[in-house]
């Protein structure tokens, strides 16, 4: 059976536990954790969001925050390159990008650390399909729902005799570990928006084991995408890991017979552009929750605008976790 590419959004987690997997809830709970971020940095972040005690609740609020971080990094680099005795920034300003990075990392960590699991009635046909076809899997969310289940099922078992690889090896991330050599035919597991398991160590991106991640893990990283949609491309471009994943997304879509988009809002224009580029020649299957208070015609029009194509099939379900038609031919 030919390969497909399966792209999973946050609707996967929301179908299981909407309270835990709500980004708004995660951002608020980390903000209110007295050990997650200092009061000084909270004040600075609030000022970026408009002042008056404003707190981050949505990705689209993070536009000015990203601009301030970029400015701080630029001024710090000028100071370092010219060996100035006086810094452009205060101590708080110098530490601000790190503090925000740690906050974002802790939000992703909270979403990742979930004690439940996907129902077996959903997982078993999905795992069986991926194992049989070596179809590619790409995730936009930070949780371990699929990643943990795939590891436990033995789908990601090293370079040889494996179903999927993500480029993370013992010494850290290597794009060479994504190359198919020695007649390998594996598929790809692409963390498109990163993972809180990723951290930088002596200039190399590495990945923790699942049991090593906890709410007090200190390291933020540049390998998590949590920002206003207009800045997501630049965050991806600044990370060697994420850039490689997006390059391989194009490769994966190119060799796939079909694209299945599961639990995705349609809000990430950088992803929509990639799907649209392949959607003229590939059939797209969209699986979404039917509780959006819109008619089927409205949703068909919505997706045709997002993917610049009418070559798609739309599944609208009361519970997306009842979907098992991974191998269906349209």
Where are the predicted features?
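SIR2/sirtuin-family catalytic core signature
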Residues: 1-16, 25, 30, 38-51, ...
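Gly/serine-rich nucleotide phosphate-binding loop at the start of the catalytic core
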Residues: 1-135, 140-148
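A structural signal for short, well-ordered beta-strand segments and their strand-loop junctions
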Residues: 5-9, 136-141, 158-161, 188-193, ...
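A Trp-anchored, charged/polar loop motif used as the substrate-binding/catalytic surface
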Residues: 116-120, 170-177, 239-248
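A short secondary-structure junction signal
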Residues: 148-151, 200-209, 271-273
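A short alpha->loop->secondary-structure connector
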Residues: 153-168, 263
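A recognition module on extended beta-rich or small alphabeta surfaces enriched in W/G with H and D/E
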Residues: 178-210
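Flexible internal linker/loop segments at domain or repeat junctions
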Residues: 203-250
């Amino acid at each position: 059976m030919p390969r497909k590419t399966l792209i999973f959004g946050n609707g996967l987690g929301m179908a299981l536990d909407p309270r835990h997997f709500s980004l708004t809830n995660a951002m608020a709970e980390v903000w209110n954790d007295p050990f997650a971020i200092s009061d000084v940095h909270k004040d600075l972040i609030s000022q970026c969001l408009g002042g008056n005690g404003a707190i981050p609740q949505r990705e689209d609020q993070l536009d000015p925050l990203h601009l301030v971080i970029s400015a701080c990094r630029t001024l710090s680099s000028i100071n370092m390159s010219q060996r100035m005795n006086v810094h452009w920034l205060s101590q708080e300003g110098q530490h601000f990008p790190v503090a925000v990075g740690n906050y974002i990392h802790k939000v992703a960590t909270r979403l990742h650390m979930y004690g439940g699991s996907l129902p077996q009635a959903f997982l078993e046909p999905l795992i069986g399909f991926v194992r049989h076809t070596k179809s590619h899997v790409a995730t936009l969310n930070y949780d371990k729902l699929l990643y943990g289940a795939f590891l436990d099922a033995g789908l990601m078992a090293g370079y040889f005799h494996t179903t999927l690889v993500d480029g993370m090896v013992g010494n850290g991330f290597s794009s060479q570990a994504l190359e198919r050599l020695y007649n390998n035919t594996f598929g790809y597991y692409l963390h498109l928006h990163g993972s809180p398991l990723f951290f930088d160590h002596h200039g190399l991106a590495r990945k923790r084991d699942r049991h090593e991640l906890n709410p007090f893990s200190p390291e933020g990283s540049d390998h998590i995408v949590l920002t206003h949609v207009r800045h997501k491309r630049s965050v991806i471009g600044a990370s060697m890991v994420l850039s490689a994943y997006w390059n391989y997304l194009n490769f994966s879509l190119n060799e796939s017979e079909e694209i299945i988009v599961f639990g995705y809002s349609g809000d990430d224009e950088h992803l929509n552009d990639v799907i649209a580029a392949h959607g003229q020649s590939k059939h797209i299957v969209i699986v979404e929750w039917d509780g959006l208070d819109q008619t089927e015609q409205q949703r068909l029009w919505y997706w045709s605008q997002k993917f610049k194509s009418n070559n798609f099939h739309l599944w609208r379900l009361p519970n997306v976790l009842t979907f098992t038609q991974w191998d269906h031919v349209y």
